[in-house]
């Protein structure tokens, strides 16, 4: 889940799929981060039934947003034909070179992913170590993905509006404020998958600096 990093276990997903099936609805499952970490061995959600739709892309887990490549899967043949018809009306086809690059990366995923997952683990560890020393923030450590969603403690004495103004204007550092996700701005999304280790470390220091001197 973005931004919390919560991972839905297979049993819970099966229960939701069963409920959806009984109501004649469809379940759309975003599996963009599926290939990272513990979820890599999970079957695609489409195996849960014909009314389950799975979507994913090469943008997140593989770090290739510039290719603009993704996919949609469903076992409902009639629905699949409707999706194909819609795609033809919107884009007709993707770039052949882009698709070839994406294909080659995906077919080599057993070679590419270990380095990516190791980098993600290092980023998560860096955030964990930083938060262990940052008493004004609290979090639930993400089980998957490449983002964390800590929040400023209610009793931390931090002026939230001033924090964001300083973080952006003075320190030129950006996080996703809570209102992006219909949450209080005491929450912030911090990404640890894309930045280099140096960039991430500097960004975390800047968050602490923008929070102000500890009380």
Residue ranges and their predicted role:
Residues 158, 166-174, 181-215:
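PLP-dependent enzyme catalytic core of the Aspartate aminotransferase-like
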Residues 103, 118-128, 139-152:
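Conserved glycine-rich beta-strand-loop-beta hairpin in the small C-terminal domain of fold type I
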Residues 1-40:
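Active-site phosphate-binding strand-loop segment of PLP-dependent enzymes
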Residues 22-23, 134, 171:
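Helix C-cap/helix->beta junction micro-motif
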Residues 48-121, 128-130, 211:
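Conserved core segment of the aminotransferase class I/II
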Residues 136-139, 173-179:
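A short linear hydrophobic-aromatic micro-motif
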């Amino acid at each position: 889940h973005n931004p919390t990093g919560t991972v839905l276990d297979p049993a819970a997903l099966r229960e939701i799929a069963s409920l959806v099936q009984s109501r004649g609805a469809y379940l759309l499952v975003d599996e963009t981060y599926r290939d990272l970490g513990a979820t890599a061995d999970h079957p695609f959600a489409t195996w849960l039934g014909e009314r389950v739709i799975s979507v994913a892309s090469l943008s997140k887990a593989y770090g290739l947003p510039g290719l603009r490549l993704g996919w949609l899967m469903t076992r409902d043949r009639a629905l699949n034909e409707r999706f194909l018809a819609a795609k033809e009306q919107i884009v007709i086809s993707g770039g052949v070179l882009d698709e070839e690059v994406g294909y080659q990366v995906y077919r080599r995923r057993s070679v590419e992913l270990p380095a990516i997952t190791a980098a993600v683990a290092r980023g998560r560890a860096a955030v964990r170590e930083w938060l262990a020393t940052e008493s004004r923030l609290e979090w639930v450590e993400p089980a998957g993905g490449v983002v964390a969603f800590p929040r400023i403690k209610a009793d931390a004495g931090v002026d939230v509006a001033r924090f964001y103004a300083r973080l952006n204007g003075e320190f030129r550092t950006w996080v996703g404020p809570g209102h992006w996700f219909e949450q209080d701005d005491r929450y912030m999304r911090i990404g640890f998958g894309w930045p280099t280790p140096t960039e991430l470390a500097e960004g975390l220091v800047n968050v602490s600096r923008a929070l102000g001197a500890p009380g």
